[in-house]
Design a protein with these regions (language model features):
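Alpha-helix C-terminal capping segments
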Residues: 78-84, 111-122
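Glycine/threonine-rich flexible loop motifs
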Residues: 98-107
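A cross-family phosphate/adenosyl-ligand binding-site feature
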Residues: 4, 18-81, 85-86
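Short glycine-rich anion-binding loops that position phosphate/pyrophosphate groups of nucleotides
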Residues: 10, 40, 70-71, 95-98, ...
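Short acidic, Gly/Ser-rich segments with clustered Asp/Glu that frequently serve as metal-coordination loops
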Residues: 10-18
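Electrostatically charged, flexible surface regions
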Residues: 138-258
Length: 258
């Protein structure tokens, strides 16, 4: 029996999480445990909660929410409190919205997959791209098909993952009929419009809402951004080693010991 731990950053009631649960339950020889945040934690990246205690709340057999926790908390604590041995796979998602290019650095969905990798477990992040508030209309039917295609291949070692890397999978905003297939591509680069909106509460105290909208992406070589917009499911292996090897040698010359 293969053990899979799943979490997300949209919260324990999110449609994408429940679609993932339903899909994995249909696979033979798989046991699924869910530990998800009690509320939405989008854009919390790979943060851990170190300044207050965390509490499991059991919702059903194998289904827990973690009170006011991050996705990385969910993975970290599940591995230490619920498992006697490590699960075979950590899956984060299905996220409500894509995680493309530099989105990965903000993403709580990808942060949970990173935590799985740091704990020595193969990990996948699944995200559903959508446009113009079409997620309710679009649904997760194509995403469920893609999960069913990829997950068994990872569990059966048809797809091998190197240590300290995870798969970032983005599902296009299209139907099964118009699905173009799979594209293994690098993460792209996007230009963002950042802004902060100033407001005042009834007592006159100022506060801000942060905003972050993607304007366009850099054209050129195929990337996760270009291909998901063309109707492909994109698969990008993400390494946790963030060293810039291109700059190592030139920097060494600037800091040679006297």
């Amino acid at each position: 029996m293969k053990e899979i731990l799943i979490t997300n950053d949209d919260g324990f009631e999110a449609t994408g999480l429940l679609a993932l649960k339903e899909t994995l339950s249909e696979l033979d020889g798989v046991n699924v445990t869910i530990v998800a945040p009690s509320s939405e934690k989008s854009a919390c990246a790979h943060s851990l909660t170190l300044t207050r205690p965390l509490r499991f709340i059991k919702l059903d057999d194998g289904f827990f929410k973690l009170d006011d926790a991050t996705p990385s908390d969910c993975v970290y604590l599940a591995l230490h409190a619920l498992y006697n041995k490590k699960p075979d796979l950590v899956i984060s998602g299905i996220n409500h919205g894509a995680n493309l290019g530099e989105d990965i650095t903000y993403s709580g969905t990808c942060g949970a997959a990173m935590e799985g990798v740091l704990q020595g477990i193969r990990s996948i992040a699944f995200s559903q791209f959508y446009e113009n508030n079409s997620l309710n209309e679009l649904g997760f039917e194509l995403a469920k098909e893609i999960v069913k295609f990829i997950v068994p291949k990872v569990l059966n070692d048809e797809i091998s993952l190197n240590q300290r890397e995870f798969l970032n999978v983005n599902i296009p905003a299209t139907t099964s009929k118009n699905f173009k297939g799979y594209a293994v591509v690098p993460a792209g680069r996007r230009t963002y419009a950042t802004h902060a909106t100033l407001n005042r509460n009834p007592r006159g105290i100022e506060y801000y809402w942060l905003g972050n909208a993607a304007l366009e992406y850099e054209k050129g070589e195929p990337s996760d951004i270009s291909k998901v917009n063309e109707g492909f499911a994109t698969i990008t292996p993400i390494k946790l080693n963030m060293t810039s090897y291109e700059s190592l040698e030139s920097l060494k010359g600037k800091f040679d010991a006297k």
